[in-house]
Amino acid sequence: MYKRLLSSVLIIMLLLSAWSPISVQASDGINDIRGHWAEEDLNKWMEKGILVGYQDGTIRPDNNITRAEFVTLINKVFGLYELSREQFADVEDSKWYSREILKARAAGYIAGYGSNVFKPDNYITRQEAVVIIAKVFELQSG
């Protein structure tokens, strides 16, 4: 169990540096991952639809990711689709991440901050990512 958790945490941490909100195809057209140390894995994740990129066709693998981007990644990796009926006060229905945050809330691995806010555009910290991953594994094994 410990090895599985550690492996999964390492994979998720690797993905942390490569997440963005708009879909792109894995192809030769993505210049910003050519020669990147994780190029092969990034292409595999794009082919599987787990990893997506920006509207300009870039992946930006060395950028930080937001809380909204991270929960979207978790939802895709773990196949979470059920939607909560209760949205956070700071998440507009028109935003690309609205449904993803509803999925995360329905799954029970996020609670947000006080005053019913999620802060979707804040960069996720490693501590927050580890807490989310631990909660998801708890839900999966429970």
Task: Mark where each language-model region is.
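Feature responds to low-complexity, polar/acidic, surface-exposed segments characteristic
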Residues: 2-39, 47-100, 106-127, 133-142
